[in-house]
Amino acid sequence: MAQQINISKYTAEVKRNLGMAVSDEIIEKDLLLTLILAEFERLGLGKELIFKGGTLLSRNYLKYHRFSEDLDFVHRDSNELRELSRSLREKRIKRFVDCFAPELSKVAASLGLKFSEDRSDTKFCSILHGRVVYTFRIYYSENQYIKIEINFVEKMIHKPKEVSVKAITDFFDSKELMFTLGLKIENFKVLSYTLDEIILEKYRAILTRNELKERDLFDLFLIKGSLEANVKQIAEKIKDSSLIKRDLRKMIADKLTLLKKNEFFKSDERIEDLAIVKYNIKDFEEFKKKITPILADVCERFLRE
């Protein structure tokens, strides 16, 4: 990295101050996310983006309840882009990516990471779903990377708000540590999803992922009032993802069947590997029971429309 950091001291101090028993690798990856966001701020890369996803939720809304591994964005004109003809939309997206990829290369170079602007190299870039979702990968080792995803057609229901994205060192008195390490981090200021939008997105993710990720349920479990979410808006959110997801009706019908059979919550993911906050396992299991009829209601509403 351009900033030569005593990683072992950093990880030890973070774990000591926050009382965490997680692997050093997870904390190191979290630091990389922070440094990448700081470079985004330095280069002004947030002007056309809206921040969303688990990293935003953890850092700015739930006081680092769990570690997140990716950086997820929506283009700020996505509501407009989704209404354009495919050819016009692709031209607009290409124009943005042609400018963004070289800047992302600068971010990687400044941190001693590996990235290629060659969009035909699928190791570094995947173009998904009719060229409306771009996934970039910045490698910090041979096979390990930070994923940066930009969705160009996400429909936003709530107006985004500007935030300063927090780092884990904002949650304890880290001045001495930062000075000792010579570590200077400028928080990334960017338009971001509101908590209401994140709740809708989490419900949508729970019902439209091919495989259930327990982290989505855990996030809703910790968000106060998430069980009072607007069912109609959740169904709309699912419907609006048709530009990205294929066979939505079959997918939702299958999820409804699993809910009715009490087979919906099977997941290979272990939330305890990512969770920072202490939580009551019985309460989490009870939450799954409470959210089941809400998820079924969303499915039924979607299938009726």
What spans do the regions from the language model cover?
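Glycine-rich beta-strand-to-loop/alpha-helix junction loops that act as flexible
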Residues: 51-55
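Structured mid-to-C-terminal alpha-helical surface segments
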Residues: 1-49, 59-65, 75-305
